[in-house]
Amino acid sequence: MTLLECLVGITLCALLLNPLLKVSAHLAAKQVEHEKTQLLISEAERALELMGRAIRIAGYQNIKTYNPSKKVDASKQFIQVNKKVGYRGSDSFSVQHALSDGVDFDCIGNALTKDRTRKDLAYQGFVVERQAGVAKGSKVNGGSLICQSLDRQGRLQNTTLMNGVNHLFVEEIQSPRGSGDKGQRVYRLGLQMTDGVLLQVHLERTVATRNLP
C-alpha cells in the first residue's frame, strides 16, 4: 500500500466517522442536559413539598393549649406573604402554628419542641436571597432558597435549603366553591429553577390551608 492509498483511506475513515462522532457528542450533551433538568425538577418538588406542608399546618392550635377567649387575626399572625422582597423580586412567606401531640418538624428537619417556639408558636419562613460568598457581579446559578426557623433559644435562624432558585412567587387565590370552610385559604406557589447557563424549569403547586380559624 502506497502512502497515497494510506492517506486516501484515512480521509475516507474520517469522513465516515465524523458524522457519528457529532451524533455521539450531541447525544452525550442531551443526556447531560436531561440529567440536569431532572435534578432541578427534583429540587423544586422537594422545596414545594416543604412549603406546602408549612401552609397546610399554618394556624394549627392544640386543643389542650387553645384559648378560645383569645381573639387572633389569623391572616396576620398565622400566615404572612410579602411580595417582591427577595432575590430578583421573589416573594416570601412565613407561617406560625402550635405544636401537636405528635412529632412535628420544621423546614430543615429539626424536631419541634417547646424551646423552638415563641409565645408557644413555631415559626417557618421561606425567602430567596442572593447566594452567600459570591462576589457582586459574578455569574451565579440563581439565588438560594432560605428556610427561616427558630433555634433552641427561640432565635430566628436562616438555613440554605438549595441553590439554583431563580424566582419564587406566592399568590393567594380564591377558595374552592362549596368548601364551606370560611377559614380555608388557597395559595399558588411557583418556583423557577436554573442552572445559571441555559436551563430553566418552572413548577407550580396549589395548596390549601387546613387549620386557620
Positions of predicted regions on the chain:
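Broad hydrophobic/π-residue packing in well-ordered secondary structure
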Residues: 1, 21-24, 31, 126-128, ...
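Surface-exposed loop/linker segments characteristic of extracytoplasmic
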Residues: 71-167, 202-204
